[in-house]
Amino acid sequence: MKNIAKYMMGAAMMCAATGVSAQALNSGYFLDGYLFKHQLNPALESDKSYFSIPVLGNMNFGTMGNVGLANFIYPTAGNKLTTFMNRSVSADEFLGGLRNINKMSMNLNTSIISMGFRGWGGFNTLDIGLRSSSSIYVPKDFFEFMKVGQSGPNTVYDLGSMGISTSNYVEIALGHSRRIFDNLRVGAKFKVLLGGLYANMNLSNTKITLSEEKWEVMANGEMNIAMAGLNVPTKEESGAEYTGNEGTLVDFDNIEMDSPGLGGFGLALDLGATYQVMDNLTVSAAIKDLGFMSWSNNTYASTNNEPWTFDGFEDLSMNEDDGNSLDDQLDALTDDFEDYTNLHRRSTGGKLSRALAATLNLGAEYALPMYDKLSFGFLSSTRINGKYSWSEGRFSANVSPLSWFEAGINYGVTSYGSTMGWIVNFHPRVLSLFVGMDYIVGKVSKQYIPLNNMNMNLSFGLNVTF
């Protein structure tokens, strides 16, 4: 379980984030042959019936952020890597590349089984898939505190709030769309959600006072973590060393998994419609994921309503002789962050209900009268998720020169900056293959992690059509 905390800390360093929608490829919204556009708007139907090749039918992985890996991980001598906390990285160099609020999200949408067919007066869909979304947001001042610390006899940091959240579940969705009038089509999708893991931590109203005598933190912090079979002990229960009232602190090092199982249950609804204004102009709208998830075996922890002392984050060095690898540095940063949060366990084994993050999609498409195989579209997507909310507007050009081939290219403006996307879709008889990206990745690391910002998306699928 220590590794989970370490990877979450690593994600926090790669940016600090907000939510991204676990949905289909936005670039395919206006393509008739794109089989999964019903995941963007339940009123949309593809031009063929289909069933997916298990797991390979629709794979969609993406990250979004206004910073990148290169803001937090730096090269050193000997072809090694180190974090921004290394004294070889200057504060000006590190802080100069950050935003006032640094955000990142990582998302996975995988269709295990999916099918669509005509019947009962309309188009019907069945989806069983994995949905995973993790988000972080961190103010720049927090990283300044980590890197610089005390810069005079008395230093005060007013950090505001920061948070990290992850939600993971299996979704079973049944959809139906039909034409009501010649120019109006409506659709709905009913979803049953089976919970895996939910975790959320938030620190608000944070004030850090640094003096020659002591470093003191005051914040309102809360944490919920829910997963079947997960045991979250206190330091007193695990036998860890502590002093004073520290016995009720969460012992992150000794979190254990006993017997995994169903971690929660939820329901959700998608609603959508399309309306043909005139022969060559169609508008559409959809609201997705109106619903809730009820989690079981939830552990709740919070800070005390009083300040606590903190020794600060280590100024990590990397010498060839000390074996201080990047992995070791992330471990050390994780330990420091756990001490910083100062979360006392209040309850365990409880219930927790949370509304889902909803997504609003609005679209308009105009086909050229003289060549209706070429169309231009605009799609607006807004993720409604509190501090993790985001929005984007995307202009696209789409062409279907052949009955079995279509493609699109688009330009978008998002909460994280501008981006370009594309999709190609081959759908001859029997088979359908699509590949696309909503965010064209720039420079990447050897592990294919975006360096300059976290905006990256890849979607592909192989399906059988009939």
Task: Name the predicted role of every residue range.
Residues 1-26, 364, 466:
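Bacterial Sec-dependent N-terminal signal peptides
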Residues 23-466:
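Subset of outer-membrane beta-barrel
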